């Protein structure tokens, strides 16, 4: 990239790369207007899960997946800085890209309770219907692939919230995953 050529060309022992992840989910996210924490809050308070765009698809992945890719990239840059310079995407395979509705339905099944309400309002902000990442470079050059499929990702996410809500320490639950 131009940035790397501008600042790192005279230091061949130092490689620069940028990394991007798909839609990261997992335990510990309590932000507002994010699908997982919004679903968990609705389920736990016996309210409907409000979905703004149920048919939108996203490259969902557990937070630990891109972290493993980032660490592999960092180790590769350390071994051979110039060979791994550039942009990298870390995300699920295209067959694991699913809809917002499928995420909510899976969480309801894992919690054994909950209901969905699909909003239809003019106030809903525009969101892209389909998001995908091309992770071929990470797959082919680094040999990185996600370990968990869509179902496993959501199972681990639901388990994290259930265990922490049940009194287990968040740090221990995360390390156990």
Question: Predicted regions: what is each one?
Answer:
Residues 23, 43-177:
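C-terminal substrate-binding subdomain of Rossmann-fold SDR/epimerase-dehydratase oxidoreductases
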Residues 3, 36-37, 116-118:
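A generic local structural motif
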Residues 1-17, 40-45:
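Active-site Tyr-X1-5-Lys
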Residues 9-35, 57, 89:
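Flexible, glycine-rich beta-alpha linker
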């Amino acid at each position: 990239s131009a940035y790397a050529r501008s600042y790192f060309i005279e230091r061949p022992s130092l490689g620069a790369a940028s990394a991007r992840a798909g839609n990261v989910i997992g335990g510990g996210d309590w932000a507002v207007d994010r699908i997982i924490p919004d679903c968990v809050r609705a389920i736990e308070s016996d309210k409907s899960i409000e979905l703004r765009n149920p048919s939108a698809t996203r490259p969902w992945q557990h937070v630990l997946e891109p972290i493993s890719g980032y660490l592999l990239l960092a180790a590769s840059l350390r071994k051979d800085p110039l060979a791994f310079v550039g942009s990298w995407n870390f995300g699920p395979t295209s067959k694991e890209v699913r809809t917002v509705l499928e995420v909510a339905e899976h969480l309801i099944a894992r919690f054994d309770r909950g209901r969905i309400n699909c909003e239809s309002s003019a106030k809903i902000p525009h969101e892209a219907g389909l998001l995908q990442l091309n992770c071929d470079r990470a797959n082919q050059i680094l040999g990185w692939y996600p370990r968990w499929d869509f179902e496993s990702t959501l199972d681990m996410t639901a388990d994290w919230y259930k265990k922490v809500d049940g009194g287990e320490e968040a740090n221990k639950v995360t390390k156990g995953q």
